[in-house]
């Protein structure tokens, strides 16, 4: 008989999912796949493109292209994480069948409670974050539905309202829908606009798509698991954002996503057609 990974509050999950951030609880802190020795093993077999790491004593407003490397290899970084002042993420760990099974187990527990917004949980991905004490993850947002689960150590994630143009603009979301990097502009006068979520082992938080956030780790090594997915809502939202970006080029001020269902459906059809035309126009590769 399988053990539940989440402590589900059905009313909270159904009522708040994707509408606002909220705290969750989980039972994964002792899971063998999420302990440092197993993660060291995983980091050495993942493709290099699936491991991102850098110095972690960063400002909240760090620009992506200026992010300093730590001068170490992947293996050195994860083995010395206690002292090397670094931040690391193991991306798409579901490539490994054991981690894929864990991801699916987690999301199948969530699925029955979010079907009104997300009938299907698609494009499932899992990420493991391993950070030195006092590491900072700069201000950024992500385009997926996300549940961040704290496994080891403590951190504070400060999350902002994606509907507030003072913290993220429609133009930034439109750029991300085309694949722009996740880091966003940040100024000190935005600090009071965020909501801090302190996370200890067993704690977690739901981060709705495109809600900006930044993270500061406590006095010990931190390990966190993110289980993420896309939905019909997220796919439609990204399509509308891409079409809106194109409309701006013609001087049109478009209606943001999720404010008009028929507009969003129409924009999704336009986005699909434009994607087909662009793919057809690409020169065929020669072998």
Question: Positions of the model-derived regions?
Answer:
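A short hydrophobic beta-strand segment most commonly corresponding to one strand
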Residues: 170-171, 219-235
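Conserved double-stranded beta-helix
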Residues: 196-198, 231, 237-287
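Conserved short histidine dyad/triad with adjacent acidic residue
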Residues: 127-141, 160-164
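Ligand-binding loop in jelly-roll beta-barrel domains
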Residues: 154, 211-225
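Double-stranded beta-helix
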Residues: 150-206, 211-212
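A short beta-loop-beta micro-motif enriched in histidine and acidic residues
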Residues: 123, 136-146, 192-193
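Transition-metal
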Residues: 1-108, 242-250, 274-287
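A short glycine-rich, His/Asp/Glu-containing loop-to-beta-strand
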Residues: 22, 123-129
